Amino acid sequence: MHRMKKLLYLFFLANPLFSSAQIADSAKREVKLQGAINFRDVGGYATKDGRHVKWGKIYRSAELNNLTDADLLKLQQLGIARVDDFRGPFEVKLAPDKIPLNATRIDLPSGSEHIGDSGSSFSKTMMKGNGDLLMLNFYSNTAPFANRYRPVFKELLQLNPDSALLFHCTAGKDRTGIAAALILYALGVNEKTIMRDYLATNYYRTSENEKAISGMVKNYGMDEATARKMTEAKEKYLNATFVSIIRQYGTVNHYLESVMGLDKKMLQKLRTLYLN
């Protein structure tokens, strides 16, 4: 019980409101593209031991189906060689990726198989107006994580030193946000910074979220409050992931070792590769 209270305290320290400094820090890492939003570098964050995550090695984004030729050239120049897609088959069919020349795309749809399927229980729950409950359940369900995120860590450990990796989903918020949080935690970034990176999605998707909310209300008859819950990144959502991990595995480090394959040797290698 004491450990759980401590965990909740640590992960609720982050302020859900953006200060100007937080926005500036987030904005400088944005990769501006014509055909994609919420595309940013995960580098630059300080770790607990005084090092920093390397810039230009790990990127996160929303969907990539509208990338222009200029965008693709920019991603090629960034050295992006691996593109991990967390979306399910319905999402991929609706908005197929465009990827830079010579990059390899990897499908990692675990847990997303029925997202976008109007007949699925996920969609039915969403339409009933249980937005908050749906999101909390989604974040706390760690069962799909092994097949979704373990390959990402494996790729990071094997990536060519001159290359970069990009991971994404549809909005670049939930599945992508969890991936970024686990990677940053493994690299030794503190919880407050991890939460700020996660919440930055609300800043980058401000106008897009309003469009999405209007579309949900107009096209699906969803009430605005439920639609807003579906589009926002909230502290309690990401907290639900870490609380679930702690309940099952005792510590996040034990989870990273037993489920993500990051024993002490692999964790040290990961930090050597991606910290300076």
Model-assigned labels for residue ranges:
Residues 21-165, 179-276:
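Cys-dependent protein tyrosine phosphatase-like superfamily
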Residues 170-176:
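Ser/Thr-glycine-rich phosphate-binding loops at phosphate-binding pockets of nucleotides
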Residues 1-4, 38, 58, 173:
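Intrinsically disordered, low-complexity sequence elements enriched in Ser/Thr/Gly/Pro
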Residues 1-23:
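Bacterial Sec-dependent N-terminal signal peptides
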